[in-house]
A protein has these predicted regions:
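Non-catalytic accessory segments of DNA primases and related replication-initiation nucleases
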Residues: 1-58, 62, 67, 72-76, ...
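Phosphate-handling DNA/RNA-contact segment within nucleic-acid enzymes
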Residues: 63, 69-165
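Structural motif
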Residues: 169-172
């Protein structure tokens, strides 16, 4: 238990190298980037929420954070994830107006490497549970989008393939 069976090592990377399984999704049509200089006046609540989480202009630009004021994701901060080619492969939608349901994420597979485009695999990575934890950790932090990392997950496979040192900073 807790050990990798080296007899199955070759199979470990099959999913990672399978281009058919590449996930690409669109951001909501109503997405408004908070990176823009000319923003609507009603962005105050979104900025106030991000500020309360310790997220400033630099993080907003780095993580390409936006929000929706209308539609299915209305009243939610949107934090997109980009794969190595720069395509959006997932996003987190977190309420900033007090919805009963804090997160309303897209109906897509969460087995991704969140924002792999920003990861330096030659440096140690810090695994955290959520995207806000990753933003707060800075540097080379990766959210596992939960509290479990499975051996067959794309993130585990990428870490093993790159032989990257890992630090874990999970909620406890």
């Amino acid at each position: 238990q807790g050990r990798l069976d080296l007899n199955e090592f070759e199979d470990l990377f099959k999913e990672l190298n399978n281009e058919e399984e590449k996930q690409q999704i669109d951001l909501p049509e109503e997405f408004i980037s908070l990176c823009n200089k000319d923003l609507p006046m009603d962005t105050t609540d979104a900025f106030r929420y991000l500020s309360s989480r310790g997220i400033g202009r630099r993080e907003i630009l780095k993580w390409k954070i936006g929000y929706c004021k209308e539609g299915r994701y209305a009243g939610r901060i949107i934090i997109p994830s980009f794969d190595m080619e720069g395509d959006c492969n997932y996003f987190i939608a977190r309420s900033f107006v007090g919805h009963q349901r804090r997160y309303l994420n897209p109906p897509a597979n969460r087995d991704i490497v969140f924002n792999e485009l920003m990861i330096d695999w030659d440096e140690p990575v810090v695994l955290v549970e959520g995207v806000f934890d990753a933003i707060a950790a800075g540097g080379n932090a990766i959210p596992i989008l939960g509290s479990t990392l499975r051996e067959r997950s794309r993130l585990f496979q990428a870490i093993a393939m790159h032989d990257t040192p890992v630090y874990m900073a999970l909620d406890g």
